[in-house]
Amino acid sequence: MSDFARNRKALHDFDIEETYEAGIALTGPEVKSVREGRANLRESYVRVRNGEVFLVGAHISPYKNATNVPQEPTRDRKLLLHRKEIDRLAGKSQEERKTIIPLRLYPKNGLVKLEIAVASRKRQYDKRREIAKKTAQREIERAMKERLRR
């Protein structure tokens, strides 16, 4: 099965250093909404607070069939990780230019999992260099394809 939500902008704006798989504490209506694909990770990030890890700023639209349950779309959601992973993430997030970002929400054995990454923000010239590299690679592939046709 495919992902429920992806943070495609993160791959463009950040250099990914290491990734972790985390469980996410959701309410029942939130799980149903996520399974419908109504989650957005674009402006979200991960914060370590008091030895616990939270997903901040993720938007999960309210499930329309759950009327009697109050639903807050952008509340902070607790992430479920092992203590060693939490300590490692806390240390990494204290380093200069490092941040923890969500990459994707996906199903695993009937549960909703979140892939998070320790990343550093790309500078503008890094983005330009990457675009130039992709363009050059595309030109090479196009030339090779044209060469093979002859």
Curated annotation (Swiss-Prot):
The entry's function note states: Required for rescue of stalled ribosomes mediated by trans-translation. Binds to transfer-messenger RNA (tmRNA), required for stable association of tmRNA with ribosomes. tmRNA and SmpB together mimic tRNA shape, replacing the anticodon stem-loop with SmpB. tmRNA is encoded by the ssrA gene; the 2 termini fold to resemble tRNA(Ala) and it encodes a 'tag peptide', a short internal open reading frame. During trans-translation Ala-aminoacylated tmRNA acts like a tRNA, entering the A-site of stalled ribosomes, displacing the stalled mRNA.
Keywords of this entry = Cytoplasm, RNA-binding
What NCBIfam families does the record tag this protein with?
Answer: PRK05422.1 (NF003843), smpB (TIGR00086)
Q: Is tRNA processing one of the keywords?
A: no
GO molecular function annotations of the record = RNA binding
The Swiss-Prot or TrEMBL record describes its family as follows:
Belongs to the SmpB family.
Does the entry feature the keyword RNA-binding, yes or no? yes
Q: Which InterPro entries match?
A: SmpB, SsrA-bd_prot, SsrA-bd_prot_CS
Q: Which HAMAP family match?
A: SmpB (MF_00023)
Question: Which Gene Ontology terms describe the biological processes this protein takes part in?
Answer: trans-translation
Q: Which organism is it from?
A: Rubrobacter xylanophilus (strain DSM 9941 / JCM 11954 / NBRC 16129 / PRD-1)
Record-given protein name: SsrA-binding protein
A cellular component term from Gene Ontology for this protein is:
cytosol
Q: Where in the cell is it found?
A: Cytoplasm
Q: Which CDD domains match?
A: SmpB
Quote the Pfam families the UniProt record gives: SmpB
